[in-house]
Amino acid sequence: PGGFACINIGDATRTIKERFSLYTNHARILSAAQTLGFSSLPCILWRKQTNAPNKFMGSGMLPAGAYVTLEHEYILILRKGSKREFGKEADKQNRRASALFWEERNAWFSDIWFDIKGTVQSLGDKTARKRSGAYPFELAYRLINMYSVRGDQVLDPFLGTGTTMAAA
């Protein structure tokens, strides 16, 4: 009880049958998580600047046809069960050993993160996808330190390039 799930997800845009639309992936995940019994906590907007040179999509310089770029992703914070209790002395010691510095706490518990830049990460394999969906080490490092204490188990169900394992 009291475990957290942190999900980094961006919305997507697609043109299907000549119709441009936004797909709100974060809203779909929140809805599914709540159906599974998770409580939704305030999320973080990660201002992840794109590598695209243009700040718009669509018809460019012509009005009523351009769209802003998506330069942010959501970090959804979910909790399963009630608030976590630290009743045993060993649990209390692990919690104290995991304490954050004042500066970290103030920066990390803000609802908008500007200071972590997205990175292009090549997989190196010409037969695979052109790029990975990996996120910067700092993103996993912060979330693990914010929502777990020393000795906790950290799960990354996708594993990918191992960023979460390295941060844990």
Feature locations, PLM:
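Core catalytic lobe of class I
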Residues: 1-168
